[in-house]
Amino acid sequence: MPEKKQPQIRSGNDPKNAPALRKSERTRQSILDAALEFLWTHPFRELTVGELMSLAGTSRSAFYRYFEDLHDLMEVLLRGVEEDIIEVAGPWLQGEGDPIPLLEETVDGLVRVCYQQGPVLRAVSDAAPMDERLEKAWTDFLKDFDDAATQRIEQHQAVGLIKPFDARPVAMALNRMDAYLMIHHFGRRPRGNRESVRNAMLRVWVSTLYGDEALTRFLSRSKTSTNAKKK
């Protein structure tokens, strides 16, 4: 992969450079925002630099100050989604204590991120079978979460929270379910119901990893919480 071009900005510690830094960041972000908006209604193959920069409201030449090409742009968008997911997945991946509330918190965050950025997942996954570079980006994206989930499952198996089984295939199955469920519901407008997607994911994750008793407790607690909100 070619080395990424970065904005030629001197140290942000110099107050004289602060306006330039802010302007550069705003321009780059406007390009990313325009790409996301385009992807709500179009596949990646229809994206052009000219149309993108028209949507962003800046010159075509400005694009190449921030990105090598459109593939680089998509890789940046996908990395942004990955970073956001890693952040919200922290409770289950790293937290201590009862894993079910930690898993709920993680899934809540995951749904929130993908509800906002679902078109990026759809665009990359749809293009991957016909585009070698995006295929690698998508494969690497999924593998990172397969690795993280496998490690966490094995940690919980080691302390008796999860029964023994081959962790990696199960982690892969759960992650593929998450990815394609959210692509289906959040990859284009109108988007699906966030609560329904969240509940479906939690049912499968809790029952698969922690068993039917844990699922029963989770459903009972969820029902109590729902009833309390209605009062």
Regions found by a protein language model. Give the residues of each.
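N-terminal intrinsically disordered/low-complexity leader segments
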Residues: 1-26, 165, 213-231
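Basic/polar phosphate-binding segments, predominantly the helix-turn-helix DNA-binding elements
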Residues: 9, 13-20, 53-71, 113-116, ...
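Generic hydrophobic, amphipathic alpha-helix propensity
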Residues: 23-35, 52, 77-85, 149
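Hydrophobic alpha-helical connector segments
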Residues: 76, 87-116, 170-174, 198, ...
